[in-house]
Amino acid sequence: MVLTMVSMNSANLIDRLTIAGASAQAFDQVWRAIWNQPHVPAAILELCRLNLARLHRAEAELAMRMPLAQSLDEEKIQSLLRENWMTDPRFSASERAVLNFTEWYHVDPQSIPDQVANEVIAHLGQSGFVALIEALGFIDGRIRIAMIYSRIQE
């Protein structure tokens, strides 16, 4: 058996999951719904996805851009990946609040301080906050699964 590195990422993960049939289809429908919901803009979710990918060191994930977030400037993305989002004036207060929350989420979702959560609520509202938490869980899970599939023997 030969070990091959497959460039799996959260977007093309469905290619590997189709064997699960209806469950895979439902999983993919949720993925698409997250990017199309009205509470957190796709561009902000893309910043979160890239930040989680950076934190996981998920190279295939970092190389990919979500089509629904095409409005994001590549220089802004590179600033995020260099960890300059806290001081770069291209990032709005809303984006900073969400990215800060994302980093706390990555470390331990249960340890997120109320102040960090309240900053997100101040910018996105309660519905946006709930949508963000659900999206982060799903995005993080898909990144992790894609990383596993990238290392599976063919």
Predicted regions and their residues:
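Hydrophobic alpha-helical segments
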Residues: M1-E154
